């Protein structure tokens, strides 16, 4: 016997409940009343960001975005969208201040100056880390969820979206099912935002759950895809993937080969 489907109506439907989806919801909520986030993981789990350090690369006001972009062009041998990176960097300080306003605490020295760690041997690309170190991802998830709750953004977990619904050329919703009960779900919306990870091979931070549904949904609905050559692939040692090295090395961590050599 077929289960009766759940039907939801909203102004904006956001597929993906990680940090990107949360920020999309907060922005959408500035313009419309009803915003709904659906995620195939547990409700409010925070996506991959919840397992991050909660640290942040920021273009502080004393720097120029073009100078940071020049470093990235050098680092990536030019294989980067410079205009997109510059826009992200230009907006990064506003997001940094938003996080601080929500209660996210970035480390400072005794004089109150922000502490940072240079990235990949570059001078200006610096990340500003959460205090206490190592618990920032969980705290970022907590404060984003609190803000979503304050703004009455609805969230539903364990929803696997299988297809987007179109009305002519416009996307008007999505269909899927509840991953635990199998109940079909229909979501009707005036706008749909895809904020799901693209997936990859041998990813870290539980990326095995990111199967690329977001890109597949967009492609199935007629969207053009680009940068697919940069889908994530990690060829890393069997016993140690690289997570955390940026923070560990300044604290004295060492990498040794099989002979015990540094």
Model-derived regions: residue spans:
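Residues forming the flavin
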Residues: 1-70, 108-110, 132-262
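Glycine-centered secondary-structure boundary/capping sites
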Residues: 68, 103, 121-125
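Rossmann-like flavin
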Residues: 75-116
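Helix-loop-beta segment of a Rossmann-like dinucleotide-binding subdomain
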Residues: 78-82, 113-141, 199-202
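Surface-exposed alpha-helical segments enriched in charged/polar residues
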Residues: 97, 119-120, 146, 216
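Short, charged low-complexity intrinsically disordered segments located at boundaries
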Residues: 98-104, 126-131, 247-248
């Amino acid at each position: 016997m077929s289960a009766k489907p759940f039907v939801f109506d909203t102004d904006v439907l956001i597929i993906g409940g990680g940090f990107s989806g949360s920020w999309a919801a907060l922005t959408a909520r500035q313009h419309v009343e009803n915003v709904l986030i659906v995620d195939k993981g547990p409700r409010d789990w925070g996506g991959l960001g919840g397992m991050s350090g909660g640290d942040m690369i920021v273009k502080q006001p004393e720097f120029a975005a073009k100078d940071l972009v020049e470093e990235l062009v050098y680092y990536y041998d030019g294989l980067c969208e410079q205009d997109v990176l510059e826009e992200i960097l230009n907006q990064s300080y506003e997001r940094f201040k938003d996080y601080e306003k929500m209660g996210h605490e970035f480390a400072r020295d005794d004089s109150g100056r922000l502490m940072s760690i240079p990235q990949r041997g570059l001078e200006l690309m610096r990340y500003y880390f959460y205090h206490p170190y190592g618990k920032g991802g969980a705290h970022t998830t907590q404060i984003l969820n609190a803000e979503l709750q304050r703004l009455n953004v609805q969230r539903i977990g364990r929803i696997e979206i299988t297809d987007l619904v179109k009305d002519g050329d416009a996307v008007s919703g999505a269909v899927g099912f509840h991953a635990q009960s199998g109940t079909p779900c229909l979501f009707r919306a005036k706008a749909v935002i895809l904020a799901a990870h693209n997936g990859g091979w041998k990813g870290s931070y539980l990326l095995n759950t990111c199967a690329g549904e977001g890109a597949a949904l967009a492609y199935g609905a007629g969207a053009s895809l680009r940068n697919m050559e940069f889908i994530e692939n990690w060829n890393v040692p069997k016993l140690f993937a690289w997570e955390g090295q940026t923070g560990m090395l300044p604290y004295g961590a060492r990498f040794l080969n099989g002979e015990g050599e540094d």
